[in-house]
From Swiss-Prot:
It comes from the Eukaryota. Residues 1-7, 110-135, 182-551 are cytoplasmic. This is Uncharacterized membrane protein TOS7. The keyword Transmembrane applies. The chain crosses the membrane at residues 8-28, 89-109, 136-156, 161-181. It is found in: Vacuole membrane; Cell membrane. InterPro entries: pH-response_reg_palI/RIM9 (IPR051380), SUR7/Rim9-like_fungi (IPR009571). Its main location: membrane. It is a multi-pass membrane protein. Keywords: Cell membrane, Exocytosis, Membrane, Phosphoprotein, Transmembrane, Transmembrane helix, Vacuole. One of its GO terms (biological process) is exocytosis. Residues 307-320 have a biased composition (Polar residues). It comes from Saccharomyces cerevisiae (strain ATCC 204508 / S288c) (Baker's yeast).
Length: 551
């Protein structure tokens, strides 16, 4: 509670107490104290509840008929009938004193509640005490004014000092009413001011927490020197900044080891404007060369593939205690800032997938660029032939081709070793072939018996992810070799053609090749096989023991 509010409450209480005291003096007149009374005439002392005459007093009564004690009405202001009516009202003097006393108690209780109770609970209590105090004070004023008027009309012109003190009592009771409004209104304002002061002490106000200290305010400089790579920032951390104030500062999101070409990327929390469109425009303006639109799109597309996700939490400026640094592009230290047509090799872009020290709920996700559909197919074709890291892809492709158990037969040629090991027919042809005589199929050819050796099981490779199932050594001859030896349609001798053929080949068997036609070993070759052939690498089928490269 502020000092001015306390002064007003003090004036209210003092006025109520003085009014109560004056009314109490009027209440204890004769016959209680025979020396004092409202009026003295003809040795008769008139009081509130009786009178005293020549040392003897009457019994206390609320109406002792003061109009009958005098023989003549000429000595009084009013006649006997009026004085008889007023004599019945004079007993309200102690009631007026009691009402002012209750108002005085309400004032004291209001002061105590405002000082003791907390600010969130004192509001309702103060409102209740205001209405109660106002009610008692109003009734006390009315009763004090009434008794003052009655006494003067009844005993005038023979009044004593006890009658005169009723006038200031009534006046003070009238003054109490506006003082009550002022006191409670100031107390409500003082509570708001106290809450404001508490908030100012805690530093929770944002408008002007330091009213008297100019050096304690925030030092905001819009044109400060904290400009990092073209990004103007606000100097929120001045020399006079208080330690108790919390403020959020946006960290420097541009990493120190970032590629210079990526410095134009704008980091924003909204996705209204595509940052990749800005990126392409900035590169076009910075290069100043006459690149056409198609080359510009290709350059932007290649650049988009080299970007990776940035995390503020895992950046070097996000944490002070050694968070994982996020590298945008790792290209083995090659300088690509001047080469605008540089393409990032596939598989070389590394993205940190480890969680940050602050939280493990965040995951690294690759940035999904806006790709140009018109350039996508051309980029794939150029990548397949002009990939910078061909050695790595060739080694992986050859390894997968050799050790894979699921490979299309149409993409493999005939194994030369197995082809050379197959028996050849003589010029005369086989001796046991019979002419075609209505047989559905010609008789099987008889070749010299060749001892079939079961294939040796390949040693288990180092990487078990390519072995889809465990292979077992067949118990008998290979069915494919038996079919090749017993069916004349699989006679692949270069100079010998079977003498008799079935005009309509059987279902599931391919016709024999022409006499002068060599075995077809060429077919569709993917890009990685063409690179293998250019580098004189042997095929994977040359190390196997069957024509189709089965294992």
């Amino acid at each position: 509670m502020k000092k001015n509010s306390s002064v007003v409450f003090f004036l209210v209480g003092l006025s109520q107490f003085v009014t109560m005291a004056f009314l109490i003096i009027g209440s204890i007149t004769a016959p209680i104290f025979k020396q004092i009374g409202y009026s003295k005439y003809d040795e008769i002392t008139y009081g509130t509840f009786g009178y005293c005459k020549e040392g003897s007093c009457s019994k206390a009564s609320y109406n002792y008929h003061p109009d009958e004690l005098s023989d003549s009405d000429s000595n009084w202001k009013l006649n006997s009938n009026a004085r008889s009516i007023l004599g019945k009202i004079i007993f309200i003097t102690p009631i007026a004193a009691g009402l002012n006393f209750l108002g005085f108690l309400c004032t004291i209780m209001s002061v105590l509640l405002i000082n003791v109770l907390s600010s969130d609970r004192v509001g309702s209590a103060s409102a209740i005490m205001f209405f109660v105090n106002l009610t008692f004070s109003t009734l006390g004023f009315l009763s004090a004014s009434l008794i003052c008027i009655v006494v003067f009309l009844l005993f005038y012109p023979h009044v004593t000092w006890c009658s005169w003190v009723l006038i200031p009592g009534a006046a003070l009771s009238l003054l109490v009413i506006p003082l009550i409004f002022s006191a409670y209104s100031r107390s409500s304002g003082s509570r708001d001011d106290d809450e404001t002061e508490e908030l100012e002490e805690k530093g929770m106000l944002l408008n002007d927490p330091y009213l008297s200290s100019k050096s304690g305010r925030f030092d905001i400089d819009a044109d400060s020197e904290a400009n990092l790579r073209g990004d103007s920032r606000t100097n929120l951390l001045g020399d006079n900044f208080k330690n108790g104030t919390n403020i959020t500062v946006v960290p420097d999101i541009i990493s120190h080891n970032q590629d210079p070409k990526l410095s134009n990327i704008t980091t924003s929390t909204t996705s209204d404007i595509s940052t990749f469109d800005k990126e392409a425009k900035d590169m076009e303006n910075s290069n100043g060369s006459g690149l056409n639109e198609e080359e510009d799109d290709g350059m932007a597309y290649d650049k988009r593939r080299s970007t990776s996700t940035y995390s503020v939490i895992e950046s070097e400026s996000g944490l002070k205690n050694g968070s994982v640094s996020n590298n945008y592009v790792r290209n083995n230290g090659s300088n690509t800032s001047n080469n605008i047509n540089y393409k990032v090799p596939l598989g070389k872009t590394e993205i940190s997938s480890s969680a940050s020290l602050a939280s493990s709920d965040y995951s690294q996700r690759e940035v999904i660029p806006h790709r140009n559909p018109s350039r996508l197919l051309n980029d794939i074709m150029e990548t397949s032939f002009n990939e910078p890291n061909d050695s790595h892809i060739n080694s992986m492709s050859s390894y997968n081709d050799k050790d894979s158990t699921l490979t299309s037969i149409s993409q493999r040629g005939v194994n030369p070793e197995v082809y050379n090991q197959m028996p050849r027919e003589t010029a005369a042809g086989p001796a046991n072939i019979r002419p075609y005589a209505g047989q559905p199929h010609p008789a099987p050819l008889v070749y010299p018996q060749q001892r079939l050796q079961p294939q040796q099981q390949q040693p288990q490779q180092q990487y078990h992810q390519y072995n889809l199932y465990q292979r077992t050594t067949p118990a008998g001859p290979d069915p494919s070799n038996v079919i090749l030896q017993s069916n004349p349609y699989f006679n692949v001798a270069p100079n010998q053609v079977p003498q008799h053929r079935n005009p309509v080949p059987g279902v599931g068997f391919a016709p024999n090749p022409l006499p002068n036609q060599s075995p077809i070993t060429q077919g569709y070759k993917p890009a990685y096989k063409r690179r293998m052939q250019n580098k004189n690498l042997p095929r994977a089928t040359t190390s196997l023991n069957n024509p189709y490269g089965f294992r």
